[in-house]
A protein has these predicted regions:
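Short Lys/Arg-rich amphipathic alpha-helical segments
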Residues: 1-81
Length: 81
C-alpha cells in the first residue's frame, strides 16, 4: 500500500463510518495517462448512488485541504461490487 492510499484511508474511514458504510479499499492508479483516486465502500444491504454521493461530497473538500496527492487526479467513490 502506498503512502497516498494510506493517508486517504485515514481521512476517509471516519466519514465512511459516519455514513453507515464500511471502507472496502482505496486505490490510486494511472489509466490512459490520467490518475484516478478511487474509494470503494460497502454496507449491509448494498451501496446505492446516494451513499457514494454523500461520501464524495464530504470527503472531497477534506482531500482538497489535506492535499495528499501532488498530481491532478479524478476522484471517484464507488461500491466494491
Amino acid at each position: 500500500m502506498s503512502k497516498i492510499t494510506e493517508k486517504v484511508e485515514l481521512l476517509a474511514e471516519p466519514i465512511v463510518k459516519e455514513e453507515g458504510c464500511e471502507l472496502w479499499s482505496v486505490e490510486y492508479v494511472r489509466e490512459a495517462g490520467t490518475w484516478y483516486l478511487r474509494v470503494f465502500i460497502d454496507k449491509e444491504g448494498g451501496v446505492d448512488i446516494l451513499d457514494c454521493e454523500r461520501i464524495s461530497r464530504r470527503l472531497d473538500p477534506i482531500l482538497d485541504e489535506e492535499d495528499p496527492i501532488p498530481d491532478s487526479y479524478v476522484f471517484e467513490v464507488g461500491s466494491d461490487a
